Amino acid sequence: MINLKNQKLNQIKLIQILFCTFPISFIAGNLLLSIHLVIFVISSIFYIKKENITFKLEIAHWLLIIFFIYTFLITTIQFQAPGFLQGKNINWVGSWPFESKPIFKSFILIRYLILALVVHVLFTQKILDLKKLFLVSLICSSFVSLDVIFQYYNGVDIFNFKGAVDRNSGPFGDENIAGSFLQKFSFLSIFGFLALYNKKHKNIFLIFIIVLHAYALLISGNRMPLILFFLGIFLLFII
């Protein structure tokens, strides 16, 4: 009985660790992120099935499923047989560009639908802790911000990746996605800070975090993430 309880706790701990460390996988690259995602989903489904956890699909879930099916079908028709929409006779096998395999790329998107449903179930069971995710996001986004700033002033980041003339990607190397990463995870960082830090001088540290991320976004060379960041900050403070 004790072994079963310990095994259950270990499974929960594994799921929690995998969930909270997603920001780290984003930095590590697409391959590790994909592996991380698959392990998390499989571990979560195995736990849900083992514990006989049931859940009811709500309207929002059905809308999400319909959206993914619609996107999958439209993408498949558009890339595999574009003439089908104009009523042309299509040689389905011969016209499919298997070298690019967009149907498989489209099908892979379904994993995010499964991820959303799994996270919903685990969150309703109070297995996932968002505060820990916020904290890891704060650490990761702050690290990327500091690395981008270091690269801007020194020509290379701490991993010896060189920056371009007008772009600084920090730990992402040749992929110019530092701005996109900071824009997405900066809000999780700010939410994490607001949720975890309730001490004196809170506003000073909050301003420091915002300025740090904003400056890193500015020198990363990604203009749209910078605009979205300021728009998000504006909406955050007026809501």
Located regions from the model:
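Transmembrane signal-anchor hairpin modules in multi-pass inner-membrane enzymes, especially those
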Residues: 1-92, 100, 121-131, 135, ...
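Residue-level detector of secondary-structure boundary/capping sites
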Residues: 15, 33, 97, 109-110, ...
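Alpha-helical transmembrane segments of multi-pass inner-membrane proteins
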Residues: 22-23, 111-118, 131-163, 170-239
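Residue-level signal for alpha-helical context at structural boundaries
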Residues: 42, 56, 151-152, 164
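Interfacial juxtamembrane loops and adjacent helix segments
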Residues: 85-93, 158-166
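Short aromatic-rich membrane-water interface segments that cap or initiate transmembrane helices
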Residues: 92-107, 165-178
